[in-house]
From Swiss-Prot:
The lineage of its organism: Bacteria, Pseudomonadati, Campylobacterota, Epsilonproteobacteria, Campylobacterales. CDD domains: AAK_UMPK-PyrH-Ec. PANTHER family: URIDYLATE KINASE, URIDYLATE KINASE PUMPKIN, CHLOROPLASTIC. This is Uridylate kinase. The gene is pyrH. Its main location: cytoplasm. It is found in: Cytoplasm. Its EC number is 2.7.4.22.
Length: 239
């Protein structure tokens, strides 16, 4: 009997915008759907967390002082619901069964997040898209990804980004930046690296949850990672 594999994939909201920098690019939705479909074909259970930065960021919205940080974060949570519904549509159009679960109750649009219900959906081969962050301000969608992964007992979190992994410093600014294939949780919290925010990394460390950072636009990358090939990615785990 094949061992159950369950993963949580975190997509940034900005990635959905493509070159436009804002909104949702249909071609990217189609690409994401094709990549997730390959995972389902290979009997991999998939949860997804999506950011909202292509629409609004709570921190940025609050910078001018007119909007409070809590309200800005609430706006950001709603942005993730918009993105989650878009991903749901794309996945369903490719023939997959999908459920969106929101941390904030909004019955007209999606289910309310219930851990055991999410687990049952995954066991039945459905993709579950987790929306509205943790439902609380001051927590990032990266922290949401780790939290949901721990709750659903995922084997790993894959942070699918626009770069191929983690460097010891910004490769856009420094030509001598070194690619890090593996690093510890403590190294991942260093200011010059910042794989995720400290809350997310600390939660992953406490639960020994591996985090793989990869290029989401590399076709077949997600499946390769889950099958054990992380040569083109960065993995955060215990030494």
């Amino acid at each position: 009997m094949q061992e159950r594999k369950r993963v949580l994939v975190k997509f940034s909201g900005e990635a959905l915008a493509g070159e436009n920098g804002f909104g949702i690019e249909n071609s990217i939705l189609k690409f994401i759907a094709s990549e997730i479909k390959e995972l389902i074909k290979n009997q991999i259970e998939v949860g997804i967390v999506i950011g909202g930065g292509n629409i609004i960021r709570g921190v940025s919205a609050a910078k001018g002082g007119l909007i409070k940080r809590t309200s800005g974060d609430h706006m950001g949570m709603l942005a993730t619901v918009i993105n989650a519904i878009a991903i749901q549509e794309a996945l369903e159009s490719s023939g997959l069964e999908v459920r969106v679960q929101s941390a904030i109750q909004m019955e007209a649009f999606c289910e309310t997040y219930i851990m055991r219900r999410a687990q049952r959906h995954l066991e039945k081969g459905r993709v579950v898209v987790f929306a509205a962050g943790t439902g609380n301000p001051y927590f990032t969608t990266d922290t949401t990804a780790i939290l949901r992964a721990v709750e659903i007992d995922a084997d790993m979190v894959i942070k699918a980004t626009k770069v191929n992994g983690v460097y010891d410093k910004d490769p856009k600014q420094f030509d001598d930046a070194v690619f890090l294939n593996t690093l510890s949780y403590d190294e991942a919290m260093q200011d010059n690296i910042k794989v995720m925010d400290d809350t997310a990394i600390a939660l992953a460390k406490d639960n020994k949850l591996p985090i793989v950072v990869c290029n989401m636009f590399e076709e077949g990358n997600l499946l390769k990672i889950i099958q054990g090939d992380t040569s083109l990615c960065s993995t955060v785990k215990n030494n």
